[in-house]
Amino acid sequence: MLKKIILSFFIGFVVVVLALGVVFFNLKSNSVYYAQHTPHKAEMEPVLMEVTRNLDWIYSPDIKGIKYDYDGYRNIYNKKYGKDEAASFAYYFREEWSYDDGNFFLYKFDKRFRLISVWNVKTLEFTSKPVDVSAVKRDIYRVVQPVIDAQSEPLINLQWIYDWVNKDRFN
């Protein structure tokens, strides 16, 4: 009798752990799809945030001109944009993002995706000129759009769980 109870609890525990693992994997690997459909503040960019934050989980297609860097920071390089070098978009583990436009400017964003600073690589100083943030965000989308377009719809849609987990992050 005692063996049956212990075995039942053990099997139940294993089933719960496996179910949580499947949900976690689904949320991570389909985070870009879920971010496209999640409610968020106007200035937030959940798609841009998730495409690099979960770069090692999402589908990274082999597209000519696009390179991925998983060592250290998570970067997406697009050689089609930028005059001197490839434009890149990166995620730092302290919840910051950076965009290198390939034209001597490095834009830094905080965890709410607000512009923190603009670094001029040519003069090695921060620029104080006003920046059109919406134009910078359009440029970032242009750089990572092929990766975003390659993401498929999840087999099991857990949008409601994704929205519940990230409600404070994007609002």
Language-model segments: which ranges?
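N-terminal Sec-pathway targeting helices
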Residues: 1-18
